[in-house]
Amino acid sequence: MERFRNDLKAFVDELYEGDKKVLVYGEGAKHARVMLIGEAPGEQETLMGRPFVGKAGKNLDAFLEAAGLDRSALYVTNTVKFRPTKRSAAGRVVNRPPTQEEIRLFLPWLQREIGLVDPEYIVTLGNVPLKALMGKAAVIGQVHGQLLDVSGRRLYPMYHPASVIYNPGLKQAYAEDMARCGKMLQEISHNTAAHPAAPFAPVI
């Protein structure tokens, strides 16, 4: 994973020369059975150098705990590894969604990261990682909470934990999806046999 990080930093430094992008790498168990993939780091994640430590991260941690899932046993990362920003009307630097170009540039690196972790289950958080791995036609509102098979991996789409902040009406659906995920993983936890490695090919 260290080589992956060094290679990614060199790639970004060359691509965004002079822009001083701060990368936030994935973290967690080296060969976690479950990999959580978000969209991109925010302000707090960039300051602390860790994924999901801001308000959305606190939501995620609370739901993981309620579902009986130990974050330290998972691997958590983002599709785009730096914070996408824009200037607000008031002149403040604020978050923005990753562009299609940013997603395209980081997709091969996400694919490589998935190969290194080699998870049995991938939980996508929000539309960005879902569309990156399943194609632009995938819609979170239609597939959330369903276990899907994508290129030999089991993929479980969920709303992004930040969505609960901006749309409280999604809280129940998010909690139900997380509880279903926790129950599903606990039911298969007795099966500790190594799963065969499968190359992951995202749909573009």
Kindly give the residue locations of the regions a language model identified.
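A polyanion-binding, active-site-adjacent surface
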Residues: 1-204
